[in-house]
């Protein structure tokens, strides 16, 4: 199968990010042109190191650029309590000499977009700081973005505060700018990612699959978004799944606003499912997932990896 969709992946590895990067690299329908890192699950130095380790593990020839070290206006609040102090606890990666590009992520994204023969798809599975910086410094790049597919937000409960999902809550100002930008946005939030559970039976079969399965199984043993006994949530993998298997998702066009001011609600995505605010839709919001189909696709795409 010939890869038909050229993508840029903005990420903050992160254990579930590792699974998403594997899918982005090895799904035959995708052509991963650039990886950019951002502070989120852990510091940007650690997310960059983790992404480089993964690229070396797979001997993947994909350029990588390091991005923002802090949110636009706030100090970083990370998720090391979920992913471990390094961000990818549980597997000993071998040493390597790989280095990121000598330019920041938002400039690297600009360069790839402006040199592409047609608009490209951005996939953001961390805080939206790099995407906001791109739009702030190079608004003309918006014409070269086919769509933005993101993992973030929620139409209901949060996982970082009572109402806010982690990726949006880390940098609400960046997220607010992105949702106001006019980009075509597909939002894969907690409404679907909490359904995206890999069962214990699925997880136990990973080591026999290939060396990627062994590595991911080791990481998942240290992942605190679920457990090996009850299943683990593959939040970030949903964004990649939508690119390849959109029919697995139920989407609704909605107006989405990001709260930036509330003492208790900053980072909340206000998803106007019923149209009460009278604002035009600015996102396609994923609200339901075919879980069995998702698991089948994950098994297929992991099998493509070495």
UniProtKB/Swiss-Prot annotation:
Query: What are the EC numbers?
Result: 3.2.-.-
Native organism is Salmonella enteritidis PT4 (strain P125109)
From the UniProt record, which GO molecular function terms apply? purine nucleosidase activity
Tagged with keyword Hydrolase:
yes
The active site lies at: 235
User: Entry's Pfam families?
Assistant: IU_nuc_hydro
Q: Which HAMAP family match?
A: Nucleosid_hydro_RihC
Q: Which InterPro entries match?
A: Inosine/uridine_hydrolase_dom, IUNH, Nucleosid_hydro_RihC_nonspecif, Ribo_hydro-like
Q: What UniProt keywords apply to this chain's record, in alphabetical order? A: Glycosidase, Hydrolase
Q: Gene3D superfamilies, alphabetically? A: Ribonucleoside hydrolase-like (3.90.245.10)
The molecule here is called Non-specific ribonucleoside hydrolase RihC
Q: What class does this enzyme belong to in the EC scheme?
A: hydrolase
Q: What does this protein do?
A: Hydrolyzes both purine and pyrimidine ribonucleosides with a broad-substrate specificity.
Q: Name one GO cellular component term.
A: cytosol
- Does this UniProt record's set of keywords contain Kinase? no
Q: What protein family is recorded?
A: Belongs to the IUNH family. RihC subfamily.
Q: Which GO terms describe its biological process?
A: purine nucleobase metabolic process; purine nucleoside catabolic process; pyrimidine nucleobase metabolic process
């Amino acid at each position: 199968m010939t890869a038909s969709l050229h993508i840029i992946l903005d990420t903050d590895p992160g254990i579930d990010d590792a699974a998403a990067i594997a899918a982005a690299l090895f799904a035959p329908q995708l052509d991963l042109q650039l990886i950019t890192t951002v502070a989120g699950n852990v510091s940007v130095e650690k997310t960059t190191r983790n992404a480089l380790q993964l690229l070396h593990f797979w001997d993947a020839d994909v350029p990588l650029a390091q991005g923002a070290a802090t949110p636009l206006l706030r100090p970083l609040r990370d998720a090391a309590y979920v992913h471990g102090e390094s961000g990818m606890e549980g597997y000993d990666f071998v040493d390597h000499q790989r280095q990121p590009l000598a330019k920041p992520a938002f400039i690297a994204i600009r360069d790839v977009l402006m040199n592409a023969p047609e608009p490209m798809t951005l996939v953001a599975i961390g805080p939206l700081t790099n995407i906001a910086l791109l739009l702030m410094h190079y608004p003309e790049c918006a014409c070269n973005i086919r769509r933005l597919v993101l993992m973030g937000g929620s139409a209901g409960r949060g996982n970082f505060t009572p109402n806010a999902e982690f990726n949006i809550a880390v940098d609400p100002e960046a997220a607010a700018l992105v949702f106001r930008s006019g980009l075509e946005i597909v939002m894969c939030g907690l409404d679907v990612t909490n359904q995206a559970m890999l069962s214990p039976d699925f997880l136990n079969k990973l080591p026999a699959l290939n060396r990627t399965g062994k590595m991911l199984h080791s990481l998942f043993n240290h992942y605190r978004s679920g457990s090996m006994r009850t299943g683990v949530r593959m939040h970030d993998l949903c964004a990649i799944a939508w690119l390849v298997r959109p029919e697995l998702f139920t989407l609704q066009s909605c107006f989405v606003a990001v709260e930036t001011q509330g003492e208790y609600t900053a980072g909340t995505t206000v998803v106007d499912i019923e149209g009460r605010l009278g604002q035009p839709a600015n996102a396609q919001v994923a609200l339901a997932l075919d879980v069995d189909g998702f698991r089948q696709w994950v098994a297929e795409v992991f099998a493509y990896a070495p």
